Amino acid sequence: MSKILVVLTGGTIGSVCSDGVRGINGDSPYILLREFSRRCPEYSECNFEVINPYSILSENLSYGCWEKLYSALSGIDTSTYSGIIITHGSDTLAYTSAIMGYLMRGTQCPIVFTAADRPVDDPESNAICNFRSAVEFIINSGLRGVFTAYRSYSVNAIHLATRLCSADCFLDEFTAYGGEIFGKTDKGRFVPNASPLNPSQSELKRDLTSIAPDKIHLSRKVMLLHSYPHMDYSAINPDGFAAVINCGYHCATACNSGGSLSLASFAEKCAACGADLWLGSFKSAENEVYASNDALLKLGIRQFTDMSWEAAYTKAVLAYNLPNTDADEFMQRNIYFEQVGKPLSD
């Protein structure tokens, strides 16, 4: 019998719709388990235990939610479970998947995030399909680590938690940074994707040490920016932030001319208030940079490489908040497969 811990946090997968408004009411997060038991009787022998550290629509996610979720997970002996499923809202799924991928990398069982495009009671919802995929992965993969299960583009995709990219706003489909999902579930089995960009199953079975104490306090803020044409940095105040992650264009470029439109002007503001400024995501395999970036990097702007902006942002949140952590060194390490095509740093 498989013993699976289900961690309910709300989101669309834990909501109901009333008069055209989706929300979390009473026991609505528990509807998922009742419907799964009804629709998937072949998994009746699974023993589900449930905890509910908080219930929110995930657009309301804050650092405090991450502190609560990690506190709940770090207090669990993961070796006593076949797996853990965390239900979450789809809006910020990529962020929580990534940060818990880092924090729970030493788990002794598979931890699988999942979500839904519509409430469980909607006939068009993929909630049961996604939850079932998470169960099938736990039972059949033989792996440990942190993952995300979500059906996208007609595939029951399994993602490495630190490589999940936010969903397309129109289709509600998720993708993987680097373009390769980790695998899929099909007919009740896990089918790995043997891409050279993915870690091997032996790598996933390595014993990894935890990077954090049992409790975390995320008191230092990190800002996330995205470059766009005519971005006016004079309107942005980095005061009070430990760091700023500036996601450049796809070549990791950002404007370096035009006064307040230049990232160089913002770098001066960041330096004046003690906020570290990061630009990326660079490709570490490339030895050449554009002239615009060469000028920016000579100003002392830091660079992050080979990872999504969700992974970079959440990594920075930990880099600037975990005790006894050198932020620069932490950002360059490959903590939990977030850096595509690179081996783990330890």
Model segments located where?
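Active-site histidine-anchored catalytic micro-motif
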Residues: 2-346
